[in-house]
Amino acid sequence: RVENEMQGMKFVMALDGSTGWMINPMGGTGKAEKVPEDQIKDMKDMADIDGDLVGYKEDGWSVENHGSVDVDGSTAYKLKFTREKDTKFIYVDAVSFLELKKESKASMMGQEMDIETVYSNYQNIGGTLRPFQMEMRTQGTTVQTITLKTVETNVEIADSMFTMPK
């Protein structure tokens, strides 16, 4: 479940495991609406908080090493992930082995778009380094920056948080 507040309005997007839904006061009715089927796979990938490298085989991905490249002054391994018709590239820092960047495609408003996600400001949470800043770009323009303020682990969350309201 993701909640954002923009211009005083609350946006909610959630997935209960199979059904995706959202509340979008700007582009919808302001009530919970089902997410189109073609976006469910993207939502499931977003819900995978372990990242792209952990459990990739179990998630149906195969990986190829495409050598070393420069990413903003850091040497990184360029890894190509393939699953069915999907392809994405993950750039992993050659020293720290942290994800620096991801290039993927996403369906937005019925269009497939190239998305570049840049990860930074890694912090240790419960023994795992997590990016506290994620910048999403399309066609070289930043379209969204997510900055985490706090992260809590092992917090009890009711299943009803993910159930689509009537």
Locate the predicted segments by residue.
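Flexible, processing/modification-adjacent segments and terminal tails
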Residues: 19-87, 107-113, 157, 161-166
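Short hydrophobic/aromatic-rich beta-strand segments that constitute the beta-sheet cores
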Residues: 1-4, 21-24, 65, 99-104, ...
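Catalytic loop of the DD-peptidase/beta-lactamase superfamily, centered on the K-T-G motif
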Residues: 11-12, 18, 28-33, 138, ...
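A short, compositionally biased
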Residues: 15-17, 129-130
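Acidic/polar residues at beta-strand termini and the immediately following turn/coil
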Residues: 14-16, 24, 93
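Gly/Pro-enriched, hydrophobic low-complexity segments
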Residues: 72-164
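PEST-like low-complexity, intrinsically disordered acidic/proline/serine-rich tracts
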Residues: 1-10, 14
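Short, surface-exposed beta-strand-loop junctions and turns on beta-sheet-rich folds
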Residues: 7-10, 28-30, 96-98, 107-108
